[in-house]
Amino acid sequence: MDIEQKIKDIVEAPNTTTLQRVDGLLELDRDVLDLGRGAPKEAMILSKKYSRKIYRAISKIDKQTGKLLLDHLDG
């Protein structure tokens, strides 16, 4: 299963609160970033790309948190 599908599954999960969905996306981001540590430069670039997708999904659920995460990713 690819990252986009995992993000979609978490965002569209039935019977979950906003907090549960944001937590699920942040856990996915943690897993993606763990793959990037000690990895070649290409893997680190890819993990940052995935983080951006995850944070954009978070911003659709919780605008304030998503904006904060995106701002810090770029900074």
Protein language model regions, located:
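Alpha-helical propensity feature that highlights long, continuous alpha-helices across diverse contexts
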Residues: 1-75
